[in-house]
């Protein structure tokens, strides 16, 4: 079979807008993209390997330049043919939803993988391992999926005119956007529309997923993130609509928020995070909300879990906690709602369905900085920044570390150092490595497992740093004082 005929088969299989009668038409569409010389190009039975063959042929035929951006733009164009139009996708999704939410999401997820929008091969490169801690098994990932930028594309982007369209990577305007050297190709991207709080929102999957069925729910309007009562209402509405998914929001302040504060959005998916498995340590009473169970979660960060079958009462209770926290100051533990009139408090909320009940976890956040901790008082401190210095956002709050790609090679050098072998270990790891060398015996047989455990302990410390009420006696007494204010 040829690469062209194989891809025609993929298009007909995935896109109900085409049948085998369209084979000649589709062949000519493909030849226009990759060059007539590719007509008899031998194919591969695997659709993504077959895609690679066509892209390589297009480059050899002079249809695209030799750059990463050009290859990705063509990949998306070739897979766009295998993807139903946005209106058709939405019709099919909501038709399938009638048979059950899971039927619809399973179909949309499978399509988003098959059409290469979800970068399955890149995601498979990520390093993932569990780490036992006093808070349960944390999930450690070293994120290798996002490709390094091609120097040619960086140079081209520097000279390209800035259009400002699409406004950001989360905008509805990305749907079908061809892409350019400084903006990802999105021709094969599709977004499900739905109403949330009387406004149009979109639902899509993340192309570089950090966990199973990593979904993004985004406001149709490009407006900044905000945490208020409508946030809790929206999150509970989403888990009512998609009960097999959790959904949460990043905080709406710098340092404690995510990397995208300019566009209102939530993240969710079908994954049970370590925080969701963590037990309640202490029950808490929320004034005026007798039908809401509340408690402090056994977790390195400061989390109040609210549970109720009554979503309206749960929303009101969550808003009460948020408002009290937003005004709460305790100088004895460096917790300050305002400094010079500037607000520092917000929450990272996470919603899920558990049987007939709703759960809302509210993670208390404070984004102050100080001379001692210029990156953030409640942010990874200097001594753990050799492993993690970036913001602690929603996914990490829940117990899944997203560590930078540099660590794969850097930790390999640390392992050599621990084994007494020649190495090029970075100086920033030396203090930590010397502590590990003094405390444990290191052999070629145990070095990998012990290194993973050590990284897990550092991540637990990172989360403790981000916790506003520390796990020691002073911190827990301060947490109890806050809970009494509720």
Curated annotation (Swiss-Prot):
What subcellular compartments does it reside in? Cytoplasm
Query: What is the protein's major site of localization?
Result: cytoplasm
Question: Which catalysed reactions does the entry list for this protein?
Answer: alpha-D-galactose 1-phosphate + UDP-alpha-D-glucose = alpha-D-glucose 1-phosphate + UDP-alpha-D-galactose
Name the enzyme's class.
Answer: transferase
Query: Which pathway is it part of?
Result: Carbohydrate metabolism; galactose metabolism
* GO BP term (any one): galactose metabolic process
Superkingdom of source: Bacteria
Q: What is its EC number?
A: 2.7.7.12
Query: Which keywords does this Swiss-Prot/TrEMBL entry list?
Result: Carbohydrate metabolism, Cytoplasm, Galactose metabolism, Nucleotidyltransferase, Transferase
Q: What molecular function terms (GO) are annotated for this protein?
A: UDP-glucose:hexose-1-phosphate uridylyltransferase activity
Q: Which PROSITE patterns match?
A: GAL_P_UDP_TRANSF_II
GO CC field: cytoplasm
Regarding protein family, the annotation reads: Belongs to the galactose-1-phosphate uridylyltransferase type 2 family.
NCBIfam families xref list: galT_2, PRK05270.1-3, PRK05270.2-2
What protein name applies here? Galactose-1-phosphate uridylyltransferase
Species name: Lacticaseibacillus casei (strain BL23)
């Amino acid at each position: 079979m040829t690469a062209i005929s194989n891809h025609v088969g993929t298009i007909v299989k995935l896109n109900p807008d085409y049948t085998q009668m369209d084979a000649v038409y589709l062949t000519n569409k493909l030849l226009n993209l990759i060059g007539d010389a590719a007509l008899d190009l031998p194919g591969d039975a695997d659709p993504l390997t077959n895609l690679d063959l066509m892209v390589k042929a297009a480059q050899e035929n002079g249809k695209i330049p030799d750059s990463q951006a050009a290859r990705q733009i063509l990949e998306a164009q070739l897979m766009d043919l295998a993807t139903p139009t946005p209106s058709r996708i939405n019709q099919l999704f909501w038709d399938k939803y009638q048979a059950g939410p899971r039927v619809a999401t399973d179909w949309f997820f499978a399509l988003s993988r098959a059409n290469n929008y979800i970068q399955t091969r890149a995601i498979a490169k990520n390093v993932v391992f569990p780490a036992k801690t006093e808070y349960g098994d944390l999930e450690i990932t070293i994120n290798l999926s996002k490709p390094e930028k091609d120097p040619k594309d960086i140079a081209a982007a520097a000279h390209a005119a800035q259009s400002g369209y699409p406004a950001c990577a989360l905008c509805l305007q990305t749907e079908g956007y061809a892409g350019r050297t400084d903006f990802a190709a999105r021709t094969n991207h599709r977004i499900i529309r739905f109403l949330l709080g009387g406004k149009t929102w979109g639902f899509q999957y993340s192309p570089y997923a950090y966990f199973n069925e990593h979904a993004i729910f985004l406001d149709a309007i490009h407006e900044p993130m905000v945490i208020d009562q409508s946030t809790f209402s929206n999150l509970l509405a989403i888990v009512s609509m998609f009960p097999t998914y959790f959904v949460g929001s990043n905080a709406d302040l710098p340092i404690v928020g995510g990397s995208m504060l300019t566009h209102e959005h939530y993240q969710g998916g079908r994954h049970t995070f370590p925080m969701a498995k963590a037990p309640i340590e202490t029950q808490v009473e929320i004034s005026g909300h007798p039908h809401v169970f509340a408690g402090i979660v056994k977790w390195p960060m400061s989390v109040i879990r609210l549970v109720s079958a009554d979503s309206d009462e749960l929303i009101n209770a969550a808003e009460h906690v948020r408002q009290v926290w937003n005004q709460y100051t305790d100088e004895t533990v460096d917790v300050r709602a305002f400094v010079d009139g500037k607000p520092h408090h917000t929450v990272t909320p996470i919603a899920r369905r558990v049987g007939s009940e709703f759960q809302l976890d509210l993670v208390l956040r404070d984004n102050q900085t100080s001379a001692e901790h210029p990156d953030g008082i409640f942010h990874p401190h200097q001594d753990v920044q050799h492993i993690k210095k970036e913001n602690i956002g929603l996914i990490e709050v829940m117990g899944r570390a997203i560590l930078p790609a540099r660590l794969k090679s850097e930790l390999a050098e640390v392992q050599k150092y621990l084994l007494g072998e020649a190495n090029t270990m970075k100086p920033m790891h030396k203090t930590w490595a010397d502590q590990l060398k003094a405390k444990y015996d290191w052999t070629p047989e145990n070095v990998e497992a012990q290194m993973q455990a050590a990284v897990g302990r550092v991540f637990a410390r990172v989360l403790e740093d981000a916790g506003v009420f520390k796990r020691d006696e002073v911190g827990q007494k301060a947490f109890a004082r806050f809970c009494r204010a509720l």
